[in-house]
Amino acid sequence: MTAEYKVQGDVAVITLMNPPVNGLGLSTRIGITDGLEKANNDAAVKAIVITGGGKAFSGGADIREFGSPKAIQEPNLLSVIRACENSAKPVVAAIHSVAMGGGLELALGCHYRIAAPGTSIALPEVKLGLIPGAGGTQRLPRVIGVEAALNMIVSGEAIKSEMLAMLPGQKLFDAIAQSAESLPEEALALARKVAAAHADGLPMPLVRNLPCKHPQGDAYFQFTRNMVKGMAKNLPAPGKCVDAVEAATKKKFEDGMVFEREIFMALMMTPECRALRHIFMADRAASKIPDVPEDTPKRDVKSVAVIGAGTMGGGISMNFLNAGIPVKILEMKQDALDRGVATIRKNYEAQVKKGKLKQEKYDERMALLSTTLSYDDIGQADLVIEAVFEEMGVKEAVFKKLDEVMKPGAILASNTSTLDVNKIASFTKRPQDVIGMHFFSPANVMKLLEVVRGAKTGKDVLATVMAIGKKIKKTSVVSGVCDG
């Protein structure tokens, strides 16, 4: 069973233990309901805390069970949430790191919620062509307001816990912990406090009982529906999110839940949903390398050097600047360097002008950028990426020089799209550190990153580059040294 049950004094703690993100698979769901039953039958237990072990509270559904009978087998998530609501003893969700999809819906079914600062909160189902299917569209508007909830549900984007806690009148969090480290103790303290408050039979607070209205009613939803329609690119799910949240303001809670479930099941059968789920699963599969375990040690990459300030070099640099990683660009001539930096600056200024980037973020990113005309100045970089002319003689000169100046353990990457990475690696005395990182043009826009594994590329180098790809928000796909 992938949920752990322990009693700490007079509080039962149910810890989700289904790495990597505590997906709510069948075994985990059974563990939660069994834990709730055990706690309610133990006279010594006065309150219950549900939390997540490892790196997440819960990332939602267990993708390993997508499309299998286990995904809907009882207790399904709706039943688990109902068990939380019906608990005779207060249930506190202690949320940290990530609470997404079904994980957030589970927390919304608890009587109280405390979150660590920096926790990512989201209902991302729209990105799979769906709407939340376990009460998210009905409960979230009741705790943060209709507009804030609809923005989250339609976009599917994550918002940090401390930002949500600042919303006027929010009832999503009863407390924000001082830190992730102090969350367990603060959750126990909250559980004991609310247990004392309910000792005399005070009814449990249920999100489902909170009011849900919007002052502009129909006019607001029609405006929102029109706006979403223009942005949805013919995908049905965003518009259906609006319908479901509108139902939360007009229907009784149970009727709204039925309406949400009907929409969810109908969307599951659409070609758009099937396609988006296929893309999601393919993206996940592409990140897994059979002979490179997930726990393979990775090298620290805290600084990057890019050789070449042209179109590719500038675009590559922006990816790392966007991720908060310092970049030093090397060129042979000052005018080429100046043109490259000017292009980067122009690209960022265009984003600022369009309102896509705040001025302070622009300033932060440009402050991370430095330049040089000397190889000697890049030797301490953790990763160096060459983006020079696509000719083997040029690559040979570059990599022989990198072999001389780069510190031990630095990763030497080539942006080549056609040349032999094994041949390039042979120009160095450290072929285990050489790898291909083929960005597609424009490199700061295109999502795909082709990671070319040479015959002698180290597993730690490959694992590191795949992790870097994720950090700079690329879809990384491993290829061999071959055509195609």
Language model features with spans:
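Conserved CoA-thioester-binding segment of acyl-CoA-metabolizing enzymes
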Residues: M1-T51, G67-S68, S79-R82
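Glycine-rich beta-to-alpha active-site loop
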Residues: A83-G133, A158-K160, G308-I316
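NAD(P)+-binding Rossmann beta1-loop-alpha1 motif at the extreme N-terminus of oxidoreductases
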Residues: K288-N347, S370, G454
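Gly/Pro- and small hydrophobic-enriched strand-loop and loop-to-helix capping segments
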Residues: H111-G133, G169-L188, L330, Q334
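Conserved N-terminal Rossmann-fold NAD(P) cofactor-binding segment
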Residues: Q334-D382, M392-A397
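Glycine- (often His-adjacent) and acidic-residue-rich active-site loop
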Residues: G52-A83, A99, K127-L130
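Rossmann-fold NAD(P)-binding glycine/threonine-rich loop
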Residues: A397-L448, R453-A467
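Amphipathic alpha-helical segments at domain termini/boundaries
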Residues: M1-L16, E105, G109, I153-E262, ...
